[in-house]
Amino acid sequence: MSKFMILYRSPASASEQLENATPEQKEASAKAWQAWATRVGYAITDLGSPLAHTTHVGPGTASTDGVSGYSILEAGSADEVESILEGNPHLAMPGTSVEVLEIIPIEDI
């Protein structure tokens, strides 16, 4: 089994999304995340957290689709991660995407 970092990308930061959400939307979002986490809990190493604004350091320009959160999952393959992510509430929001990165154990380097 390998660990995978899931980066939740969206055009607005998590804090901006929360600022603009109604109490009903916040409650519905929390319930959707709880339902997904319950369904795929076997694969969740770290459910993660929403992330605040991004600071860009270094040359070049920052991405317009910032990382608004993360999770760490454990699975046998990237294909398995794709099936685990089916029904993930983040993907139901307009303009969002998920980036899947396999974590390489430091002892394997």
Protein language model annotation of sequence segments:
Residues 1-109:
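Conserved, structured core segments of small domains
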